[in-house]
Design a protein with these regions (language model features):
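A "functional boundary" signal
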Residues: 2-10, 14-141
Length: 141
């Protein structure tokens, strides 16, 4: 009888471990659909910015849980708006990219973030800060 209880306890423990591991894996990849959409939008950005914008507008931003995911969305959305001639004059959209990429981004991410920061300053008519952003971008290269 003791052996039988041991086996059932062991089986229950094994099921719980598998359930925990499965939950951990899925919680880490819970935004994989959003990440796929970001990748699709990025691939379309230069040739079909209107399609990239449509994809980005269809992403539920609350599904982006990581700082990198939020920053990537912010930068891609800023690019899509600019490439579709939609001028923005606030940093509401780009700010997550500025906050994340300036410290943690690759050189390309930093450069692109500074460039779109400069574009927003240009749209606001603030040529001095636009030039500073472009100079910061230039210094990264």
């Amino acid at each position: 009888m003791a052996k039988r209880n041991f086996v059932s306890t062991y089986s229950l423990l094994w099921v719980l471990v598998i359930a925990f591991i499965t939950g951990a894996v899925f919680s880490c990849t819970d935004n994989s659909e959003a990440e796929k959409r970001l990748t699709s939008a990025e691939a379309l950005m230069n040739q079909h910015p209107d399609s990239a914008l449509a994809i980005l507008q269809g992403i539920d931003r609350s599904s982006l849980s990581s700082g990198n995911g939020k920053a990537r969305y912010a930068l891609l959305m800023s690019q899509a708006l600019d490439k579709n001639y939609i001028d923005t004059t606030t940093f509401d959209i780009l700010q997550p990219a500025i906050d994340y990429y300036i410290d943690k981004g690759t050189p390309d991410e930093k450069l692109t973030t500074f460039y779109y920061q400069g574009r927003i300053y240009q749209n606001k008519g603030d040529e001095d800060n636009a030039m500073l952003s472009f100079i910061n971008a230039r210094e990264i290269t």
